[in-house]
Amino acid sequence: MSDTSKGIPQEQLPSQELHPPPMPVINLGHLSLDDPTVRSRVVNDIAKACRDLGYFQVISHGISQSVMDGAIEAASEFFKLPNEIKKEYASDDIRQPVRYDTSSKDGISMSRAFLKHYAHPLCDWLQYWPQQPPIYREYMAKYAVEVRVVALKLMEAILEGLGIGKEYMQEKFEEGLQLLSVNCYPKVSQSDTSIGLAAHSDYGLLTILLTSCQGLEVVDRSSNSWKVVQQLPHALHVHVGDHMEVLSNGRIKTVVHRAVLNPQEARISLASIHGFALHEKVSSAKELVDEENPQKYKENSFNDFLEHLTANMDNRQRNFLESLRM
């Protein structure tokens, strides 16, 4: 083991070999077909992936390659800006509508620069987004709008798969928040054991991830080991979030994942995080609670998550989901 680990715990070190996890690939276009048998099969495939793994990839999702490439380009150009421009958005206040920062926290050596900003309703938040590079607002907005459509389609299918109906709390989903986490992970040497982002699960209901190259790892539940996610052309990666586990009363489990650094090239990732509005409480669906399956989680909101995070900034064990278990 290289002594360049800089105090990284053994379980956090990047995987040394490629072990692709079982990765369901869902053709999302089939949800829109008139054939109810095909739709039912896709809904069942999504339900199984959420239940067994907590992640899957989608193709034929309706976002053009040019829109995806434009978002990656806008992100890449932002991170190439001089530091004095990027630092205009620097803040330790996690409630800022736009926030730029770099990661080296929790006593673990991490290498990441990120820009986070809200994206829905777009008319409320676009004015706060970076004006440099000139393409940023236009290209990123196109992607934000289209990926949100994908998220709503997925939410309908997941709720249908849970047996509570695709219209369940539809208005709350449509009026909910969207947060874009735009990340840049540097290229590193093979001997560098720094990671990009430590192991974590995502808050919110769903995260849809677009990446420029390989670097995502997930915990495979069957072996309790890290697995490298292979990069599929034109695919989006979907993560189940903490709030989905709460809403499903534990029928669906959030996925633990991390970002590792790529020795071939710098990596851009765009995580679009979707959930209820800031103060809207998420609780286990009453249809999924009974004597055999009592309520397992306390109701909570995205604002509750922010308060928990703020209160536990220096605590390496600040697992929000664990704090919700009853």
UniProtKB/Swiss-Prot annotation:
Residues noted as binding Fe cation in the record, renumbered to the chain: H200, D202, H257
Tissue occurrence: Expressed at very low levels in roots, leaves, stems and seeds.
InterPro entries per UniProt: DIOX_N, IPNS-like_FE2OG_OXY, IPNS-like_sf, Oxoglu/Fe-dep_dioxygenase_dom, Plant_2OG-oxidoreductases
GO biological process, one term: flavonoid biosynthetic process
Enzyme type, top EC level: oxidoreductase
Catalyzed reaction equations: a (2S)-flavan-4-one + 2-oxoglutarate + O2 = a (2R,3R)-dihydroflavonol + succinate + CO2
Molecular function as annotated in GO: flavanone 3-dioxygenase activity; L-ascorbic acid binding; metal ion binding
Record pathway: Secondary metabolite biosynthesis; flavonoid biosynthesis
Fe2OG dioxygenase domain sequence ranges: 175-276
Disulfide bonding pattern of the chain: none
Cofactor(s) this protein requires: Fe(2+); L-ascorbate
Key words, A-Z: Dioxygenase, Flavonoid biosynthesis, Iron, Metal-binding, Oxidoreductase, Vitamin C
Segments for region (Disordered): 1-21
Free-text cofactor note: Binds 1 Fe(2+) ion per subunit.
Bias-annotated ranges (Polar residues): 1-15
EC id: 1.14.11.9
Description of what induces expression: Induced by light.
Residues the record lists as binding 2-oxoglutarate: R267
Function of the molecule: Catalyzes the 3-beta-hydroxylation of 2S-flavanones to 2R,3R-dihydroflavonols which are intermediates in the biosynthesis of flavonols, anthocyanidins, catechins and proanthocyanidins in plants. Converts (2S)-eriodictyol to (+)-taxifolin and (2S)-naringenin to (+)-(2R/3R)-dihydrokaempferol in vitro.
Matches recorded under PANTHER family: OXOGLUTARATE/IRON-DEPENDENT DIOXYGENASE
Similarity comment text for this entry: Belongs to the iron/ascorbate-dependent oxidoreductase family.
Protein name in the entry: Flavanone 3-dioxygenase 3
Source species: Oryza sativa subsp. japonica (Rice)
